[in-house]
Amino acid sequence: MKKDIHPEYHIIDVKMTDGTVIQMRSTWGAEGDQLSLDIDPSVHPAWTGGTSRLLDTGGRVSKFKKKYEGLGF
């Protein structure tokens, strides 16, 4: 393998939607940073068998619905 071309691999904290924090190795962020998830396997419809829910982060879903409300979707 070539040296000095791969990203640093370190331990980060991952905060699940229920507040649980787990440690895992990742190339994301820096050592000790915390990654907060909007959706995780405990609430994702693909894993729970439930219906999907829309996350309106930043108002993008609302903006889309308002823009195309006259088309009858």
From Swiss-Prot:
Record-linked InterPro entries: Ribosomal_bL28/bL31-like_sf, Ribosomal_bL31, Ribosomal_bL31_A, Ribosomal_bL31_sf
GO cellular component: ribonucleoprotein complex; ribosome
Matching PROSITE patterns: RIBOSOMAL_L31 (PS01143)
Pfam families hit by this protein: Ribosomal_L31
Gene3D superfamilies: Ribosomal protein L31
Coiled-coil segments: none
Keyword RNA-binding in record: yes
Record carries keyword Lyase: no
Gene Ontology molecular function terms on file: rRNA binding; structural constituent of ribosome
Keyword annotations of the record: Ribonucleoprotein, Ribosomal protein, RNA-binding, rRNA-binding
Gene Ontology biological process terms, A to Z: translation
Family indicated by similarity: Belongs to the bacterial ribosomal protein bL31 family. Type A subfamily.
Physiological role: Binds the 23S rRNA.
Subunit structure comment from the entry: Part of the 50S ribosomal subunit.
Protein name, as recorded: Large ribosomal subunit protein bL31
Source organism of the structure: Dinoroseobacter shibae (strain DSM 16493 / NCIMB 14021 / DFL 12)
